[in-house]
Swiss-Prot record:
It comes from Mycoplasmopsis pulmonis (strain UAB CTIP). It holds the Pfam family OSCP. Keywords: ATP synthesis, Cell membrane, CF(1), Hydrogen ion transport, Ion transport, Membrane, Transport. Belongs to the ATPase delta chain family. Its main location: membrane. PANTHER family: ATP SYNTHASE DELTA CHAIN. This is ATP synthase subunit delta. Coiled coil: none annotated. GO terms for molecular function: proton-transporting ATP synthase activity, rotational mechanism. InterPro entries: ATP_synth_OSCP/delta_N_sf, ATPase_OSCP/d_CS, ATPase_OSCP/dsu. F(1)F(0) ATP synthase produces ATP from ADP in the presence of a proton or sodium gradient. F-type ATPases consist of two structural domains, F(1) containing the extramembraneous catalytic core and F(0) containing the membrane proton channel, linked together by a central stalk and a peripheral stalk. During catalysis, ATP synthesis in the catalytic domain of F(1) is coupled via a rotary mechanism of the central stalk subunits to proton translocation. F-type ATPases have 2 components, F(1) - the catalytic core - and F(0) - the membrane proton channel. F(1) has five subunits: alpha(3), beta(3), gamma(1), delta(1), epsilon(1). F(0) has three main subunits: a(1), b(2) and c(10-14). The alpha and beta chains form an alternating ring which encloses part of the gamma chain. F(1) is attached to F(0) by a central stalk formed by the gamma and epsilon chains, while a peripheral stalk is formed by the delta and b chains. It is found in: Cell membrane. The gene is atpH.
Length: 179
């Protein structure tokens, strides 16, 4: 069960610190990187949430992995380990990212793919969408095992599908029209 109050207050605190320290972009980038590390490496979260691992070992692990991270974010990670709240970090970071982006007037979106996109490809798609939508766009790449091929993008009210399901839908529509 997610502790919504803890998630909301922690995300708010992180985003407020980012603005107070005038490090919004740095926080955005680093929170996004850490979120992806945890998302794509669930064994890291399991290790840090384990009751059989000593707290000192968990802290040392965090300090070694994230030694180049902004100290304020590192302290937040260490506090989450101390308070046994690691399992909430994914939601906290997502909400903090969304809050910072909203204040910076950046539109958040999601691109669903069958495989993880490279950072270069994701940036290329973000740039094209930013030009098309006439606003800065930041995409989160999520893996959708139900997609057979292609992608789905959602940014606000804008949706684009280019996958096997959309091709089949188009063929069915074409057949119904008698084309």
């Amino acid at each position: 069960m997610i502790d919504n109050h803890y998630v909301q207050s922690s995300a708010k605190a992180l985003s407020q610190i980012a603005f107070e320290e005038k490090k919004e972009k740095l926080f955005l980038n680093q929170l996004f990187i850490i979120k992806n590390i945890f998302s794509y490496n669930p064994e890291v979260v399991e290790y840090l949430a384990s009751g059989s691992i000593k707290l000192e070992n968990k802290k040392k692990f965090i300090e070694e992995i994230f030694d180049l991270i902004e100290p304020l974010i590192l302290n937040f990670l260490l506090m989450a380990v101390e308070d046994n709240k690691i399992k909430y970090l994914d939601n906290i970071f997502l909400k903090a990212i969304l809050t910072i982006n909203k204040k910076l007037n950046i539109e958040n979106g999601i691109i669903y793919t069958t495989l993880k996109l490279s950072d270069k490809k994701l940036l290329e798609i973000e740039k094209k969408l930013s030009v098309f939508l006439k606003k800065e766009v930041k995409l989160l790449n999520l893996i959708d095992k139900e997609l057979i091929s292609g992608y789905e993008i959602q940014v606000g009210d804008f949706k684009q599908r280019n996958n096997v399901a959309s091709w089949i839908d188009q063929m069915a529509l074409s057949i119904k029209k008698g084309d």
